[in-house]
Every structure is written in C-alpha cells, then in structure tokens.
Amino acid sequence: MNENLFTSFATPTIMGLPIVILIIMFPSIMFPSPNRLINNRLVSTQQWLLQLTSKQMLSIHNNKGQTWALMLMSLILFIGSTNLLGLLPHSFTPTTQLSMNLGMAIPLWAGTVFLGFRHKTKASLAHFLPQGTPVFLIPMLVIIETISLFIQPVALAVRLTANITAGHLLMHLIGGATLALMNISPTTALITFIILILLTILEFAVALIQAYVFTLLVSLYLHDNT
C-alpha cells in the first residue's frame, strides 16, 4: 500500500479511537526503576547527564526558580525520549503535532508569567514599557511588548514542531529517492543511502538538542519572572 508523505504525522487510531495518550505514556516504560543498590553503566550515565543538565539550567535560578527542577527535568526527559522513539521506522512522533506542543508550551509559559505577576508585580509590568521611552511611543510599545509576550508559547511550540517535522520529511524524501534509484543507478542509490545514514545520525542529535532548547527557553522564561 502506498503511503502519503504525511502519513507518519497523522494521529494513529484503533477502531476509530485515538491512541496518542498511550504513545505519549510509552517512553516512561523505557526507564524502569533500578532494584539494585549499585547502578549499572546505563543508569549511571543517565544520572550523570541529568545532573549535568540540571546544574546548567538551575544555576541561574534563585530558590523559587529551583522548585521547578523536577518539572524541567521531567520535561526534557519526556521530549527527548519521545523524539528519539519517533525516529523508529513507521512510528508516530507526538512532537510533530502542533496541538500537543502548544499543550505543553502554554501551561508552562502561563505558569511562569503568573509566578512573575504574583511575586514581582512591578517588575513584570515594567517589561511592557522600557525605561526612557518617549511619551508618543508609549502606546505603541505597550502593544508590541504585549504581543511579544503572548507570542512566546506559540514560538516555543512552532519551533519544536517545525524542526522535528522538517527532519522527518527530509529523511522520508531521501529514503524514497534511495529506493527509486536502486534499479536505475545503484551507485547514486549508494550515495543517497550514505546521506540518509548521516542524516539519521544528525536527527538523533537534533532530537536531543530540541528537547534541550525547549526546556532551556522555559527555564529562561522562569528566570525572567522569579
């Protein structure tokens, strides 16, 4: 059966019911809790990476911001593992859905903004009007700063969606070209296959980098409001 180019981005269903919730929960099964006092090398490596990432992200925060440590680490683990599992053939990547990414970005952004208005009301309101602004520019700047504030979660979600979707589409196109060239020009097919392997390795890096960038931007929004 011939598949559409965007088939892998459609929400999978069973008997007409969406199973995206099960797919989203699946990565948590991949990280079982160790039942031994001494961890193996894989668990030790995971813990080292988490400690390194948390140290980099939380070093700029005060005590109020550091209470979000568990949330930020859970977020980067979830997005990273979901992106990596989406690289498996014929699999579904939830982070290619803009609705899901908005569902993550908007509550996290709203939480940081609410925290800022609650604990730093004057400083949060001061962001809407830079110091030394001419009087005739005040209405325009307030509108611009308000729009830039509300566009933050949209930019956060669109960035993740666009990067993951673009990589998957490029892999799909190069893979299709490789299959089409196998009977026409084996040498060219071999070259495109090597390019596909290199692109796949790059996509593994992109999957982790995008998870880090998404979480880092949430951390910066939190820092601006605490």
UniProtKB/Swiss-Prot annotation:
Component of the ATP synthase complex composed at least of ATP5F1A/subunit alpha, ATP5F1B/subunit beta, ATP5MC1/subunit c (homooctomer), MT-ATP6/subunit a, MT-ATP8/subunit 8, ATP5ME/subunit e, ATP5MF/subunit f, ATP5MG/subunit g, ATP5MK/subunit k, ATP5MJ/subunit j, ATP5F1C/subunit gamma, ATP5F1D/subunit delta, ATP5F1E/subunit epsilon, ATP5PF/subunit F6, ATP5PB/subunit b, ATP5PD/subunit d, ATP5PO/subunit OSCP. The chain crosses the membrane at residues 12-32, 68-88, 97-117, 135-155, 164-184, 189-209. The gene is MT-ATP6. This is ATP synthase F(0) complex subunit a. Keywords: ATP synthesis, CF(0), Hydrogen ion transport, Ion transport, Membrane, Mitochondrion, Mitochondrion inner membrane, Transmembrane, Transmembrane helix, Transport. Subunit a, of the mitochondrial membrane ATP synthase complex (F(1)F(0) ATP synthase or Complex V) that produces ATP from ADP in the presence of a proton gradient across the membrane which is generated by electron transport complexes of the respiratory chain. ATP synthase complex consist of a soluble F(1) head domain - the catalytic core - and a membrane F(1) domain - the membrane proton channel. These two domains are linked by a central stalk rotating inside the F(1) region and a stationary peripheral stalk. Signal peptide: none annotated. Belongs to the ATPase A chain family. GO terms for biological process: proton motive force-driven ATP synthesis; proton transmembrane transport. It comes from Ceratotherium simum (White rhinoceros).
